[in-house]
Amino acid sequence: MSKQKIIIRDISWLSFNSRVLQEAADDTVPLRERMRFLGIFSNNLDEFFRVRVATLNRMIAIGQKKNMHLEMNPSLILEEIQEKVLEQQKEFERIWNEILRELKKQKIFLVNENKLNRIQQRFVQDYFNEEIRSNVVPLMMESIREFPTLSDKSIYLACTLSKKDKSIAKKFALVSVPARRLPRFIILPSKQNEKHIILLEDVIRFCLPHIFSFFGYDSFSSAIIKVTRDAEIDIDNDVSTSLIQKIEKGLKNRKKGKTVRFVYDKEIDASLLAYLVKRLGLSHKDNLIPGGRIHNFKDFIDFPESVFVKKNPRKKPFLHPALKNVSRTTDIILQKDILLNFPYHSFDTVIDLLREAAIDPEVVSIKITCYRLASRSKIINALTNAVRNGKQVTAVLELRARFDEEANLEWKEELEEAGVKVIIGVPEMKVHAKFCLIKKIVQNKIILYGFVSTGNINEQTAKIYGDHCLLTANKNIMADVSRIFHYLELPKMRPHFLKACKTIMVSPAAMRKQLMQLIQKEITAAKAKKTASITLKLNSLSDELLIEKLYEAAKAGVVINMIVRGIFCMLTENLKFKEVYAISIVDEYLEHARVMIFHNGGKEKVFISSADWMVRNIDHRIEAACPVFEKNIQQELKDILQIQLNDNIKARILDNELSNQYVNPRNTKKIRSQLETYNYLHKKSI
């Protein structure tokens, strides 16, 4: 494909993060939600530097571009990233200052160490002595030969100690802010009807004279700094070590990964900045980014809600109508398929299904894939209870789920101690598909049932992620799920099991080929002047071969509607592509579902999937796209996607210029798809 025919993946991702920033800028969004979006933006950007920028740096270091699916030279991509990130940083600061003004209108004040009254000063000093002092160990930078490795999840106060009469030479010190052990936000004693909040680092700033009292200085200044490190885990080819040992080694090495970004308060003492850059071995190529006074904004996702007079609680999830007044979820699933739509439907149904299986005397085994689990997972509880009740339980645990590796290693130990058979994935491929297979024997007859999901089996993320979960006892679907588990148990000996799947599209075995065939069928229909359409709901679209096929379909006249939240590399604005409509929706819930609908000559084919249309998902992961057979569920998915395509409040047009222009309501009824979807599903449940 000509490189001019797609948008650069990393630049497209930055455009997505700009949409998150738009939500923070939107004054119709509740104030606490606006702060949450600033936190999400910050967290997203941290991960982007840890992963994508780090990867580009690696490629430059080894002079590699070939076969890495890049649209242009990595050095040029990095230059464009730097330019856009600096633009976003300025917009971030503007929005933050606007939010601070709005907070003041609500009598909420984020105060620093210089704005405290006497009562607050005493409170802060006492709080420091009682809660913080024992967690603070300052480092005198000139006194240490080997500079410490700065954690990329921490923030640090870089301090300048000086004497007003200049009788003592100034010194530099470093204080780690213990925000992972202590609350970042501290509510201060305040006047009636006012709320004053101070940040943990500002409490430490206030107490710098006490921390450094024995050095004889009387003037102290400080600035927040932060580093971001390469988060890639290198898994070597040493056959003498297990995958677990390699991951454990990789996690240790990650803490010392190469610095890919250094962010600092732009008001920092110039000599201190120069000293830090030198001691850290940085250069201007290492993304030195000036920022504001506050860093690690991701903590603002959890800004205390109690300070707001007006609360904006999320709508509570509700029970699927088919499960109302039902004593056992299992009985209904054995009769018909049920589609759970999170976060609107309650995730408790999934937990109930596993709990029922754990105590059902007819159930003999449970198999499940686990990618990211909740911190206090009820799924794990159900699985361990099943073992206690004599069931054979198998959990496929993906140890390489990025940033969840340590948690999954801990889950592995807990599950194995309980007697669960743990499979730690497939060599060289992540298991990203989400399945559960429950086997019961009734009157010597084997019955298989379970679920296929677009998202993680995680009760925490199910409250804020938009996903679909198909509960089913369909024999064809469950036969394929069984085949996939057979493969996962012995991947090197059973590769034929993936290829044997008859209803589920599985990557890397056949998904690419099958998707190409489905698109080609629409192309053939369009060329024959027949109705032809494709509707896609994805997180990301960057696979060049699939994009090329979509271009071919668009040229042939296939109507293509796309809802893509994140990366979108397809160019849509072309006179020959009149039938292409692409939007991105960013709102209160994270749109995480993947759905594909092909007209198929009037016999529509509808799939829910764990896979985005990216090379990594199609060729290098275990992924699954599951067909939806029942007409009422097909219609429900079509209705939900149509509601989203009609969104004119939170939808942005995905255009060639990455402008993120909102869809124009044009005096029609205002449609906010997440609210409309809630109403649509809730009405069904009444």
Protein language model regions, located:
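N-terminal localization/anchoring segments of enzymes in phospholipid and broader phosphate metabolism
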Residues: 1-534, 552, 556, 568-686
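Glycine/threonine-rich ATP-lid/beta-loop region of ATP-binding domains
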Residues: 544-547, 551
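Hydrophobic alpha/beta core scaffold segments
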Residues: 559-563
